[in-house]
Every structure is written in C-alpha cells, then in structure tokens.
Regions:
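C-terminal single-pass membrane-anchor helix
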Residues: 221-261
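Solvent-exposed, non-transmembrane regions of membrane-associated and secreted proteins
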Residues: 1-231
Length: 261
C-alpha cells in the first residue's frame, strides 16, 4: 500500500512545501518597506540592462556542475532561502517556487531560473528562462507542461509585481539548440523549459510567452488544502480495492477448503 501511495503522498508533500514557501515569501514581501522593494527591483533591472545576450546552460545535463555566482545569487532575494519569485500556471492549477540557478538540489525541489538569462522582472529586450523536471516521483513540477497550448497564460509573481505571459510559441529542440532562448530586441519574453519525450528526455520542450497585461484569473489556482481531498480520495479508493481483494481471497480460500473436504 505504501509503495502505491508514495507518488501521491510525496507529491502532496512537495506541494505543501511550495505552499508554505510561497506564503512565507508573500508575507516577507508585505513586511518590506517600499524603499527596499524599489532597491531590489532597480538592482534587477540594472542587471538586465547590462545583460544583452542570454547564455544557456542545459539544466538536465548529467555532467552539469553548476555553481551559483555572485552577485547573481543575491538578486531579488528577500531572505536566505534562495527563492527568487514564484511561478503560477493556471491551466495546470499549479504554483511553484522559483529558485536561483539550476543545481541538482534546486531541480529536485522546484523550478530553477537559468543564470545567464534575464532576471524575471520583465522589461523590453529581456528573455527570462526557467527549468524544471518532468516525471519526478516526488514532485509534479513541469510534468504536465505539454498540456499547455497557444494562448494559455502563466504568471511570474516577483516582489509586489505580477507579470503575465501569453504562450505564443511551443517548440521541441535538441539540448544544444538554444537560439530560441535568445533575447529579442524590444520584446519581453519568458520561456519554460523541460525534458521531452516523457521518460526519454532526449529533447527539450520550450514553452514561450510574451508579456501581456496581468488580469487575475477568475478561477483561483487550487490550494494545497483543496488538493488534500485528492489524497483522501486516493486512500479511500485504495482501501476499498484492498478490502474487496481481501474478501475475494477469503471467499476463495473458504471454497477451496470445502472442496478438499
């Protein structure tokens, strides 16, 4: 039973961690004074102004020896958790923490912002790129990213700003094909990257969006506590199946004993 429930329970635990982390982030941002928020945002925009070319590192390369650099590791940091912002994908009913960099440790627990790409604060001639795994037994993350279609939106919540991006390109490329992640002069872009095909991981799925006005979704993203009902349903269903199996097994044994007599 434990083996059967492991993916569901571990994923819900990961979502709980994201839920708590996002709540802590929002609370921390609320407690910051306006001057500090303005400083962090100005610092990030200055960084982007001096960053004119994206340099892409493959987050899913087994030989990835990525190490955070300074001062990148302090950009948009409101505390010492390594959290940069959080990503919301209404279509998938998911909210995910975005951390600095793409180390193996980061990608085991959340979304990683690829250092070498624009910081996720928007603006002309910027292109921020974020990566996450598919199919981790312990976390859903970008597992269902292939369900996104043109016209869908995703949001980046950073400090006290909410950036909306509408998907305008979906591409599948080889890991070394990174030209689609370049900065496009005058455009404000964001791309989500994961492995594909599912379980094979020889290519990369790129879901790109361009900046549009942010309008809060009419249907709010499902909260962790609402998702707990999924776990209850899974447990009840599994218990029912096991109960039926036990009954069938007992009936079978009783009939078998009667036949032997």
């Amino acid at each position: 039973m434990g083996i059967l429930l492991y993916p569901t329970i571990s994923n819900l635990w990961n979502e709980y961690i994201h839920f708590v982390s996002i709540g802590h982030y929002e609370e921390t941002v609320t407690e910051l004074d306006t001057a500090e928020i303005d400083r962090l945002m100005a610092e990030a925009r200055d960084y982007n102004a001096n960053h004119t070319k994206n340099v892409i590192m493959d987050a899913f390369d087994d030989d990835n020896q990525y190490v955070l650099t300074h001062p990148y590791d302090t950009m948009l940091a409101v505390d010492s958790t390594g959290m940069m912002c959080y990503l919301e994908i209404p279509k998938l009913k998911e909210k995910m923490v975005v951390y600095h960099g793409i180390s193996a440790k980061v990608l085991e627990r959340g979304v990683g912002h690829i250092e070498g790409t624009s910081l996720p604060v928007g603006g002309e001639s910027t292109h921020t790129v974020m990566s996450a795994h598919r199919g981790l037994p312990s976390a859903k993350l970008f597992t269902n990213l292939d369900q996104i279609v043109l016209g869908d939106q995703f949001y980046i919540h950073v400090l006290n700003e909410h950036l909306a991006y509408e998907v305008d390109e979906i591409n599948v490329v080889l890991p070394e094909e990174t030209s689609l992640l370049d900065i496009v002069p005058g455009q404000d872009l964001a791309t989500l990257v994961t492995c594909t095909p599912y379980g094979v991981n020889t290519h990369r799925l790129l879901v790109r969006g361009h900046r549009v006005p942010y309008v809060p979704p009419e249907e709010p993203t499902v909260t962790f506590w609402e998702k707990m009902s999924e776990l209850k349903f899974a447990i009840i269903t599994l218990l029912a199946v096991l109960l039926i199996a036990d009954i069938v097994f007992i009936v079978f044994r009783v009939r078998r004993k009667k036949k032997k007599r």
